C-alpha cells in the first residue's frame, strides 16, 4: 500500500517562514497562486543557509512528495537528506559512516515552480532540506510517500500489558515495511535485499500475523532462483540451510503440499551439496562462507552455531522427505556426521539457543548461561530462539527479558526494531529522535561489523521474530 503522510513536527530550521503550515494538508496537487496573502499558509525558504528538518513521527519506507508554489527564477537547487535518526539526518556523507548505500539518502536536486515531485526511496523518519542558492521557494506541502504491507491480520496481541502491546506493534511495523514491495527485504534503508538466512525470523513474524502470504513464497522462490546448484544462497552455506529450516516450518504450519512439491528436486540437490560441507569426522568446511549472526562472528562458539543450524536443517529435511515419500538417507548421513562433534557452546546465548532447537536439550549449565547477565548478549536476529529457550524453563522470566530488551529500544525512540542492539549501548547515550551534545549518539557512535555508525539499519526485518514469541507465550 502507498500512503501520503504529513510531518508530525518541525524539528529545526533557519531562514524560514510559516514552517508549521506543513503540518496540515492543503491538497495533493500543485496550484498557481497569485495572492500574496495565501503565501502566508506556505513554507517559505530564502537564501543560502536556509534549511528545515521535519520529523514524520515513525520509520517510513519511500521518499518525500514536495508540492511547490512560486520560486524566484522558477527553479532552485536543494540538498535533501533522509535519516532514520535525527543524528543521521544532520551529518555529511562519510561522517560516522553515513552513506548512500542501497539507495541515495543524501543528494542535491533541482525543483521548479508549481511542481509536484517525489524524491528518494529509502528508510527514514527525518528529512532535512537545505536551499543551496540565493533564491526563495514556497512549499505548499511536503508529504512522506510511504509504502507498507496492508493485509488483514489473523493475529494481534490483545492482552492488557501495554509494554508487550507496543513491542508487538513496532515489530509488526518493522516487518510490514520490509515486506511492502513484492519481496521480503532485510531493511528499508539497508539492506534492500533478500538474504535467505535473514528471512527466517521475518517469515516467522509474517506467518504469525497474517498466515500464508504470496510475498513469502515469492521470496523463498527468489532465493532459490538466485542460487542454482552448486551455488549457495547469498554465497553463504548456512543460508541455504536456513532455507530448508524455513521450508520445513512452512509445511508444518500450512500443510501446503502443492508448493512444497515444487521445492523437492532443489532440496535433494542441495543436500548433495551440503554433504560436502562436513567430512566423515564431523569437521566443517571453513573455506566457504558461513554465518550464525554478527555478534557471534569470530567467537569461540561460531562453529558450534553453524553445527546447530546444520542439524536443524537436516531435521527439517528428514521431515519433508518423509512427508513426501522420498529417501532420507542423505540427510540422515549428514546428521550422523554432524553429531560426531559435540555441540558445546562456551559463551554465546544465541548458540546455546540454537543447540536447544536442534536437539531439544538444555542442560542446567546452559540455562544458567542463557540467563546470566539478563539481556546482555542478546541479538535481535536470534531473539526468538533465545527467548524461547529461556521460556522452556521459565516463561515469566523470558517475557520480562523480552520487555527489557525490546523495551529499551522503545524508550530510546524506536518506531521499528534494529539490526542489532546491545544493552550496554544505553550507558551515556541519548535518544535517536534528539541530539544531545553531552551524550553519545546511540545511532552514530555504535554498531559493529558491516553496520558501524549511521550505516546501522534501524528497521531490520530479522528483529521481528519476537512476534512469534509473543504469540506463543504472551497469551491474551
Labelled PLM ranges:
Residues 24, 29, 34-37, 102, ...:
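Alpha-helical structural elements
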Residues 92-94, 193, 455:
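A subset of signal/propeptide-processing and intrinsically disordered low-complexity segments
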Residues 153-160, 189, 204-205, 300:
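Second-shell loop/turn segments in exported
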Residues 188-190, 194:
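Glycine/proline-enriched, intrinsically flexible loops and inter-domain linkers
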